Amino acid sequence: MDIRQVTETIAMIEEQNFDIRTITMGISLLDCIDPDINRAAEKIYQKITTKAANLVAVGDEIAAELGIPIVNKRVSVTPISLIGAATDATDYVVLAKALDKAAKEIGVDFIGGFSALVQKGYQKGDEILINSIPRALAETDKVCSSVNIGSTKSGINMTAVADMGRIIKETANLSDMGVAKLVVFANAVEDNPFMAGAFHGVGEADVIINVGVSGPGVVKRALEKVRGQSFDVVAETVKKTAFKITRIGQLVGQMASERLGVEFGIVDLSLAPTPAVGDSVARVLEEMGLETVGTHGTTAALALLNDQVKKGGVMACNQVGGLSGAFIPVSEDEGMIAAVQNGSLNLEKLEAMTAICSVGLDMIAIPEDTPAETIAAMIADEAAIGVINMKTTAVRIIPKGKEGDMIEFGGLLGTAPVMKVNGASSVDFISRGGQIPAPIHSFKN
């Protein structure tokens, strides 16, 4: 690394809010299955606290050594519905509490995997887990939950979609922060390091390290230097910048893997914003020439950004995965918040943007009197985009307050303006239940 690259890296950290957003250890709990739920809970606690005992210390050590902030250390586990199914328990809150206790013991920020995969129907543990979510999130501090309700290969489980509309409402009623830790997916990935949607897939190694990077401020600063130039130049600039960001993620992942004695999994090539000024994906899009995010051209700008981040990142590391793209959470991005407040960004435009970005309707506050069926219909729309386009989409909706209010979450979760929701009913649509079949182009064999 020459002196110019060293000074560039220092500037990225000190002036442009570059950080490693997360080191996430994925842990399989399949060997913790037990017909007695309390014994299963104890096995889960013991395995997590043993395997991840040094995760936080190693993360802090690497951050100090390289001078690069590592914002979060997290754990993801096997979907708990698979573990709970071996028991005769009627709810899995005790397993959520075991996860929470383990997370607090090892000092991680979040633990993900209170999850179920129901894209084609319910198995024994799935419905029990889903109905346990409101209490599990209300009675724990660090547990995150996700449910996969659709996939390109399976279609969309509309019965589960309806159930999740109800569960989101119940979760919001039981706790202030619970819904911020609950994601509904289509095409969920098994190696996602980001919360709240991380879980450890059954096809993964027993224990693995995945890394998520963050650098929208770095990309914006690079684009400031090419103002007025063609999109060819913009694309090349984003690609080269993404390469630098991802290269550091690769280094951190390899170091963590070696020191913890576990396999290195992937680097997630996502641009993840924070509420801090200078760390916004929205401002990157505006730097391309948009007066404000939400105006015409926003989706095209996001498409360019997303694609070039992937192209630059793929070259920088040997294994990429996770969600890999630009995150557009409203509450976690000061530019997105401003666009909602000035009226240029609405739910319909956000939905269009999710056909491009790496997640979906993320950290969006809606009025608390929004019917469960309307929330379910939002989930169905997002799932349809993901299923048809063969990409991951998700919904993390916050039903709180009334239109125009500001909902304060604090920390990385930021502040969300409560957005207007279409008032026309979707009740008859959602009440049908059943399965929307897989699209014709999913049949590849």
From Swiss-Prot:
Residues passing through the membrane, by range: none
A Pfam family this chain is assigned to: DUF711
Domain of life: Bacteria
NCBIfam families registered for this protein in UniProt: PRK05313.1 (NF003700)
Family from the record: Belongs to the UPF0210 family.
Quaternary structure, from the entry: Homodimer.
Stated name of the protein: UPF0210 protein SP_0239
Species annotation: Streptococcus pneumoniae serotype 4 (strain ATCC BAA-334 / TIGR4)
